[in-house]
From Swiss-Prot:
Gene assigned in the entry: RNF26
Tissues where this protein is expressed: Ubiquitous. Up-regulated in several cancer cell lines.
EC number: 2.3.2.27
Organism in which the protein naturally occurs: Homo sapiens
Subcellular location: Endoplasmic reticulum membrane
Protein name from the UniProt record: E3 ubiquitin-protein ligase RNF26
Cited function: E3 ubiquitin-protein ligase that plays a key role in endosome organization by retaining vesicles in the perinuclear cloud. Acts as a platform for perinuclear positioning of the endosomal system by mediating ubiquitination of SQSTM1 through interaction with the ubiquitin conjugating enzyme UBE2J1. Ubiquitinated SQSTM1 attracts specific vesicle-associated adapters, forming a molecular bridge that restrains cognate vesicles in the perinuclear region and organizes the endosomal pathway for efficient cargo transport.
Residue intervals passing through the bilayer: 24-44, 60-80, 147-169, 183-203, 220-240
Pfam families: zf-C3HC4_3 (PF13920)
Reaction(s) catalysed (UniProt annotation): S-ubiquitinyl-[E2 ubiquitin-conjugating enzyme]-L-cysteine + [acceptor protein]-L-lysine = [E2 ubiquitin-conjugating enzyme]-L-cysteine + N(6)-ubiquitinyl-[acceptor protein]-L-lysine
Amino acid sequence: MEAVYLVVNGLGLVLDVLTLVLDLNFLLVSSLLASLAWLLAFVYNLPHTVLTSLLHLGRGVLLSLLALIEAVVRFTCGGLQALCTLLYSCCSGLESLKLLGHLASHGALRSREILHRGVLNVVSSGHALLRQACDICAIAMSLVAYVINSLVNICLIGTQNLFSLVLALWDAVTGPLWRMTDVVAAFLAHISSSAVAMAILLWTPCQLALELLASAARLLASFVLVNLTGLVLLACVLAVTVTVLHPDFTLRLATQALSQLHARPSYHRLREDVMRLSRLALGSEAWRRVWSRSLQLASWPNRGGAPGAPQGDPMRVFSVRTRRQDTLPEAGRRSEAEEEEARTIRVTPVRGRERLNEEEPPGGQDPWKLLKEQEERKKCVICQDQSKTVLLLPCRHLCLCQACTEILMRHPVYHRNCPLCRRGILQTLNVYL
């Protein structure tokens, strides 16, 4: 126990020293940062101060110019006002002349008005006769309209009486039905209200019991969580102390625990289940696709050749690729001789094509065969499906399609190599043929 106390006291002393060093470091760094912040604020505000002084100087000059302009404007306004007074006196003389003209025009208008009155008297007498004739016609038309209105009112009153009779009959028929529906609705409402009251009466004790259980669980959880940290710290301190003072005892405990774990049949069953799941995962179709794609990317240097060299037959390459994809789960157990044989099978179509091209005379070749070979040369060297549309830089090899280039560029930088010359790919360029 004394050794435990010594270790605990030593740890406390070390923590105090570390706290003191951290406080001194924080004080020094904070003072240095404060001085740097003050210096930066001074340097930062110096241009602003200079600009503010220049701005105030410009404002003073601008205000003096505005005062000078205001004096000039006021002087100009006084001159214009005097000129306007002179013009107003001239206008008064013109007004007197205008008054004389108005007097002459008034005399002419009065004479014309007298003439118009005579003409209007003649016209008004004719208009009175015409108005009397129109009144007679209006009285006759009003009598005719009264007769027609009376007939229409009689028809409307008869129709209204007929509709009121039909409504009375409908009310007499549907009234009892509505009363029956009201009684049924009131009965159902009474039953539902009594059921709700019974449910509330039964729910109150259940709610009290649930609240009591929740409060007890909350109290227990708070007690466990408060004491859990202390228990964990005590267990950690005891484990470290036992490990430091008695390492042999710790090793014996570990070996005994491992032996007991290996002796349990459940451990072996769990291990067998994990191995079976790993075999199923490795034998799945998705894992086969991923493994075949990785093997295709790894076999690029074996597929490549010089730029423009004829590639192997697509059907043979596809058959070899299918065979390799079917044997992926047993790839870890295949020998080196089988891998060498598969590599030889993959490279054989290319060499056979080159040998046939060397044996055939230049003049006796079939043009359709040449065209087919030319189309095959345009295919991607990896998938043998799409056309070559991407130029690799700086090696300048046109050998990949867009999809294979995207898959290649997803790899790390040190794996981005040309499949023909194995040089690093720094940039790609799309080519449209």
